């Protein structure tokens, strides 16, 4: 029983330490694979959102947005784009964070989507053991 109590205490301490406020800075690479068709003049848009994981019916808040204009890629060659998303915001306790990544045209239509390590799902970052550096791989939204 004493061992169980110590384990719970350590788990609570670790969770509290992980949620201490820090810098909400996310860095990484957006990879456009060889198979993606030629693109030119598009915009790469990355957004960092903050949400309360305990409130299901509340929308996430936009913390930072980065737009890289005139993105270009040639089919048959992998293209890498480095990014840094926000340096001035702080991580808030008991909040979670995720990023979105899209390639959009001049009218705002989304063509490509970035996924963490090429895996579908929410790209969580910064808290709960999630990284502050990510590798996003673009894919066609229609596939």
Predicted ranges, named:
Residues 24-33:
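A short, amphipathic beta-strand motif
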Residues 34-41, 55-56, 90-93:
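A short beta-turn/strand-edge loop motif at beta-sheet boundaries
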Residues 43-49, 98-102:
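Beta-strand signatures of extracellular beta-sandwich domains
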Residues 64-88:
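A beta-strand/beta-hairpin structural motif
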Residues 103-115:
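Short acidic/polar inter-strand loop motif in beta-rich domains
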Residues 121-143:
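Extracellular beta-sheet/turn segments enriched in Thr/Pro/Gly and aliphatic residues
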């Amino acid at each position: 029983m004493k061992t169980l109590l110590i384990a719970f205490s350590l788990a609570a301490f670790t969770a509290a330490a992980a949620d201490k406020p820090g810098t909400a800075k996310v860095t990484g690479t957006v990879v456009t694979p060889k198979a993606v068709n030629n693109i030119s003049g598009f915009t790469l848009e990355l957004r960092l959102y903050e949400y309360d994981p305990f409130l299901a019916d509340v929308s996430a808040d936009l913390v930072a947005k980065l737009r890289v204009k005139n993105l270009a890629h040639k089919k048959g060659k992998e293209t890498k784009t480095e990014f840094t998303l926000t340096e001035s915001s702080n991580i808030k306790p008991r909040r979670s964070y995720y990023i979105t990544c899209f390639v959009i045209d001049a009218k705002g239509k989304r063509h490509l989507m970035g996924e963490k390590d090429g895996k579908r799902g929410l790209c969580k970052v910064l808290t709960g053991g999630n990284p502050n550096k990510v590798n996003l791989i673009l894919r066609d939204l229609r596939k």
